[in-house]
Swiss-Prot record:
Superkingdom, taxonomy of origin: Eukaryota
One of the GO biological process terms: neuropeptide signaling pathway
Keyword Disulfide bond: yes
Tissue: Expressed in the midgut but not in the ring gland, CNS, thoracic perisympathetic organs (tPSO) and abdominal perisympathetic organs (aPSO) (at protein level).
Protein name: Neuropeptide CCHamide-1
Disulfide-linked positions: C2-C9
Modified residues (Histidine amide): H13
Keyword terms: Amidation, Disulfide bond, Neuropeptide
Amino acid sequence: SCLEYGHSCWGAH
C-alpha cells in the first residue's frame, strides 16, 4: 500500500 512507504497514495505514486 502507498501508506506503507510513509507517504500518501498521491505522494508515493
